[in-house]
Amino acid sequence: MTISRHTHHRRRPPLAVLSLLLAVVAMVLGPVPASAADPGWWNPVARPAPDSDINVTGEPFKGTDSQGRVRGFVDAHDHLMSNEGFGGRLICGKPFSEAGVADALKDCPEHYPDGTLAIFDFITKGGDGKHDPNGWPTFKDWPAHDSLTHQQNYYAWVERAWRGGQRVLVNDLVTNGVICSVYFFKDRGCDEMTAIRLEAQKTYDMQAYIDKMYGGPGKGWFRIVTDSAQARDVVQQGKLAVVLGVETSEPFGCKQILDISQCSKQDIDRGLDELYRLGVRSMFLCHKFDNALCGVRFDEGALGTAINVGQFLSTGTFWKTEKCTGPQHDNPIGLAAAPSAQSKLPAGVALPSYAGDAQCNTRGLTELGEYAVRGMMKRKMMLEVDHMSVKAAGRAFDILESESYPGVISSHSWMDMDWTERVYKLGGFIASYMSGAEGFSAEAKRTDALRDKYNVGYGYGTDMNGVGGWPGPRGADTPNPVRYPFRSTDGGSVIDKQTTGSRTWDLNTDGAAHYGLVPDWIEDIRLVGGQGVVDDLFKGAESYLTTWGNSEKHKSGVNLAAGSSASASSAEWWNPFVNFSPGRAVDGDSGSRWASEWNDNQWLRIDLGSANRVGRITLDWEAAYGKAYRIEVSTDDTNWQTVWSTTASDGGLDTARFSGVPARYVRVQGLQRATQWGYSLHEVGVYSG
């Protein structure tokens, strides 16, 4: 506004009028105070103007239910700050900006004037990528359920999800150095840990940005939490508990080149300590590309082909497959053509072909990967098993089960669902990817009996700004559309169509275009899948925080067998410089082992020195393992009792659980070898429970 001076005389307006005019200007151009009609604690004291509408009325629920349990939905997998990763130009727009909504919700520079250079958009969406790049205030073409390159996590849209009943959000800090390096547009370097640090800081900045609207530090609804008790307190206040996670392909610099690790145990410890200081409490060890920690679950189709090419460019190796040994399997490997990706291969290098009956990644959890898993357990962090190959996930489960560690999460449907009961039995948490209401409800009902058995809730993983795609519209003429306005699950709020600028979204015709439509999607699930599915989701916050809390309280058991006296039916002897004696199975060194002669009827006996209550025994097999064996205990070395047996061991790390019994002596009695060699055990652990 420009005020010009005139030479003719005019009566000056009264001071009160000037003050009123200035106040009006301040209201138009400055922050917007809370509505006088709805002045509750949940409304900001001063929201920036202009800004997005929330379109929810009513007070967010607080407290607990009659049994002291928190309530609310949990999004176990979102990417609030992915616009800061991948070189800074893959995801266009920001979740907040001090300069306001117009600055936050604008497209990448190269998308102007018509999207011709929106290369990643047409790679992922198809077509030519052309679109109207203008965001605020018109939003003609984005955000959209099928546009993977535009901001969906604007803070006000997240606020709407919170107002609709969500109480926990896991913000996975994400990037990918390979994608960054090959993408045409970037405004920064591609180091993954640099991006993770920046995204963590931006999340804290977003918390401060929201706090400022509510009058100062600690007063906003967006609360970053670093322990489960803090999270429970936030949820009981009716606010949103935000947990930091990490999903990246080369954590701590742990890539592999030509199968040679590029990191050390010291790098892993330093990396875990740094992430913990940043507030990270949940993480993936591998994502998309095989690294020095673990092999991945493959992507399918053209995207899988492109990622396989990316793996070669980064590591010098393509994915390798083998026949699966159990009912679990990795995704069928991508074989569809991806010309733009394949053109980047060096001359003379072509994608390998893969046998149709070989659907498992040959790479599992490496020695460094096992070290990282145990490092996370030591720090009471939660392990995300999605994206791990079947072989890697299986070994990770073995380790978690051997320690009774509950901190395991499957957050967005990238785990073989045959592992579901293993997760629940440990005390872990499962969330399903944000798919269409029909598919999501069907999957929820498929696993409903297991949730009832273990008395747990359910979650969803929106994976917004995670380049995945989201539920499309069911259509305005569907027989049971979402009817606006509708009531929130708790009944305390009324939710209408969401408006930002001049654009109003309707889930029936737009699908899940952005995060603000999460409450609408949940209402769609209620209509399609029934109230029971929504009730399980509403118990999600309690179950997630229970998993987290039990992880924090976990204490490693004392290995009663460590350093004990051991004897055996035999010990292999073929090299005078290698010791395979019985004591090697209880020496605390995972690199040593006891090995028997090459026949079935062999045993290993451990003397604990005194009688103890025993309820759990772990066997860490070398490649020569026992397919069938039994575990016996005795108090006098004469009268033996069988406490556990199997005829179908698959090797690796076996955990035998049984009702606690007094025992001084423990014996592993082999019945049938799985290989032509004898029985070979790296370590035997004996625990009270």
Sequence positions of predicted segments:
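Secretory targeting and sorting signals
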Residues: T2-A36
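N-terminal hydrophobic targeting/anchoring segments and the immediately downstream early-domain regions
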Residues: A37-T362, E367-R374, A393-E401, V408, ...
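Short polar catalytic/cofactor-binding loops
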Residues: H77-M81, A566, S570-W573
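Residues that line or immediately flank small-molecule/substrate-binding pockets and catalytic motifs
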Residues: L173, H287, V390, H412, ...
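Catalytic beta/alpha-barrel core
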Residues: M382-M388
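Extracellular carbohydrate-recognition regions
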Residues: G557-S569, L608
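Aromatic, loop-rich ligand-recognition surfaces of beta-strand-rich domains
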Residues: W573-N575, F580, R584-G689
